[in-house]
Amino acid sequence: MKALVEEHSDFYPVLISWIKKEKPTKSQLALYKLKLCKKFKQRHIPTDIEIYLHADSEDASVIRSCLTTKPMRTGSGVSVVATMTKPYKCPHGACTFCPGGLGSSFGDVPMSYTGNEPSTMRGIRNEYDAYRIVFNRLEQYIVLGQNCDKVDQIIMGGTFTGFPPKYRESYIYYSFKAYNDFSKLFFSSGKLDLVAFKKFFELPGKVGDKEREAKVASKVLALKSKDVKTLEEEQELNEKAAIRCIGLTIETKPDWGFASHGLELLKQGVTRIELWVQTIYDEVLLRTHRGHTVKDTLKSIADL
């Protein structure tokens, strides 16, 4: 969101009132915004997100359908939340297929990524903290005017089963805790408390406002440390939360995707595994330092 310039006090009330009455299409809304900016001599044309954030709770629920941004992202009724694990070396070392990793030409970034992907940049902003990343992504869905009551989380960033067991458990635990805490904070009555949401996230605000980001991060971290439970308890709570994680995906390699790994992942709530099968030729696997054989690939597929 761009920095807000001085605005006429009647600008947003007039605009919101018109949207409530007319229920405009996106093109009609764009034209009316231009017309109203000329009338009030306002140089900054507000985005749909800015309009939504200037509405009170009652108006916001009425005009949200006219202001929803990027509706295809949740058109299926499920919101995808991609979270990134911290940069970490694969147990066997680096292979030709992975551009990233610790000490890569892109810096210290997660394996298989360059640091320029949206999910990676979100991870960097939130210091690869699963709890903060989930809060940040849910915040983005809300300001886009989208529903996020059913979430499909994809844990990205490398061979997840190759991370230390405590890290894996903690990462999944804080993901579930974030969904539950976000639900309690902003959906305690069953519907979005927009006033509480805007107050917590210091909205309306400016993209890139470091002071605002620091304040929000401090609030999120304070929540993270409160009322710590077990993973099983958070998963049970999530079954009835306003925002439910209905799918959990991890990434791994064939040699880290055998039956023992699958059983552990099932206990942690994982519902889907992305198995990286780069080639079906042993010679290519050897030359690219992949760290496993075609036999391992076949065994992994059979086991999982």
Specify the residue positions occupied by each region the protein language model found.
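Flexible, acidic/Gly-rich N-terminal and inter-domain linker regions that tether
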Residues: 1-223
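Radical SAM/AdoMet-radical enzyme domain recognition
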Residues: 180, 206-304
